[in-house]
C-alpha cells in the first residue's frame, strides 16, 4: 500500500488496454492485397480445411485473415477489405475478410444472415 506522500510524488498510472487488432491502427476496416490464398487446419478437437489469406494492408502490415462462408473467388493480387475478429480455432488468425466488397463476392445461395456474407436479397 502506498502512502499519501508517495502518491503526491508519483501519481498512479492508468492501465492501458492492448488492442486485439493492431494492424488496423484504430480503423474499423483496412484495405489490403492478397499475397497468398490457402487452407489450414484448426486446433486440436476440431478438424477441417479453413480458408485463409495472407494480406498486405495499406497500413503496411502483413496479416493472416479468415475467409468466411462457403466458396470464394479470392486469388493472389485480389483487393480485399479486412476487419478485426479472431478465429478461435486458428492460432494467429486475428482478422476477417469482409464479403461482398471490393474484389470479394458474396456467398452464393445464402438466405439467412445475408448481411454478414455480403449476399443480396433473393427475388
Curated annotation (Swiss-Prot):
Keyword Ribonucleoprotein: yes
Listed SUPFAM superfamilies: Nucleic acid-binding proteins
The name this protein goes by in its record: Small ribosomal subunit protein uS12c
Gene that encodes it: rps12
Chloroplast is among the record's keywords: yes
Gene3D superfamilies per UniProt: Nucleic acid-binding proteins
GO cellular component terms given for this protein: chloroplast; small ribosomal subunit
Organism of this sequence: Chara vulgaris (Common stonewort)
Pfam families attached to this UniProt entry: Ribosom_S12_S23
Family indicated by similarity: Belongs to the universal ribosomal protein uS12 family.
Amino acid at each position: 500500500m502506498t502512502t499519501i506522500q508517495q502518491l503526491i510524488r508519483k501519481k498512479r498510472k492508468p492501465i492501458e488496454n492492448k488492442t486485439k487488432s493492431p494492424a488496423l491502427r484504430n480503423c474499423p476496416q483496412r484495405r489490403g492485397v492478397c499475397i497468398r490464398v490457402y487452407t489450414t487446419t484448426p486446433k486440436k478437437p476440431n478438424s477441417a480445411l479453413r480458408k485463409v489469406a495472407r494480406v498486405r494492408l495499406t497500413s503496411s502490415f502483413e496479416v493472416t485473415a479468415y475467409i468466411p462462408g462457403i466458396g470464394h473467388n479470392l486469388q493472389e493480387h485480389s483487393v480485399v477489405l479486412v476487419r478485426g475478429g479472431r478465429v478461435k480455432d486458428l492460432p494467429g488468425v486475428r482478422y476477417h475478410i469482409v464479403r461482398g466488397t471490393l474484389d470479394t463476392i458474396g456467398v452464393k445461395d445464402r438466405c439467412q444472415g445475408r448481411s454478414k456474407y455480403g449476399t443480396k436479397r433473393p427475388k
